[in-house]
Amino acid sequence: YLSARRRELYVPGADYPFRNENKRITGKIHMLQYLSDAPKGVVVISHGFTESAAKYDEVAYYFLKEGYHVYIPEHCGHGRSYRLTADPFLVHIDTWRRYVRDFLKACRYIKKAHPDLPMDLFAHSMGGAIGGIAAVWEPDWFHKVILSSPMIRPLTGNVPWPAATGIALEKCILGKDEEYVAGKKPYDGGGSFETSSATSKPRYERYKNLRAEHKELQTWSPSYGWLWASAEMSWYLRLYGWKKYTAPMLLIQAQTEDLVSVRALKNFAGKINRQGKTT
């Protein structure tokens, strides 16, 4: 069913006006397209940290059965999209704006392909931060917005958030932004369902096996550049972004959150409900 409706696409990433010519890196965004037989709308999925479009086959299936075309662009440094580092296991970004601009470039392509259909956003974890900011920058593009465990603020383990962001900033200033965050390591094929944040063992095992077979899916750990970018996205959303939403929004919190701050998510939702322009 899925393979009959699936198509691989590549769209150019967004141009970003860096002052430093060495940072004017652009590439192609890889995207999976699933076309419904009787579409009533389009859903764009913004995936999470270290994930890929391949992880969302089941989600795409459910949206297809409900009558939606589905598009899943892969963020820079993930899957088959372009990367800023030669290390295949490292998730690295030079500026959070690159994520958002690339995502909106993909959305612009999708809107042109289906001008008469409403476009909805389903965004998870890191993709929730990226998609959440995209909906701030282009509020008229998205008919409805679903943020699933959005990374309003990432959790940083035993290191307090202020200390973690301070260390990340220092590393970036010293030109060490492509270093692995302390305690993180390259992909080694390890990991287990019991120590993961997954709740379905068959789903966990499926993607673990898929990742082992495909090098492009083996992104595993963050760089200090990524950590600093996540901090900047967090501040943007919490201090400014929440004021700008106009589309109806559904925020989803997991029963147990291991990777994102529940407190930050609840505060974000509270601000929107009390003073925002949407529900």
Model-predicted segments: where are they?
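Catalytic histidine neighborhood in serine/cysteine hydrolases
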Residues: 270-279
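Alpha/beta-hydrolase-fold enzymes
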Residues: 126, 130-218
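Active-site glycine-rich loops that stabilize anionic/oxyanionic intermediates
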Residues: 48-51
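Alpha/beta-hydrolase active-site loop
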Residues: 91-111
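Short beta-strand/loop motif that positions the catalytic acidic residue
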Residues: 245, 251-253, 257
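Conserved alpha/beta-hydrolase
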Residues: 53, 60-86
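N-terminal cap/lid segment of alpha/beta-hydrolase-fold proteins
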Residues: 1-35
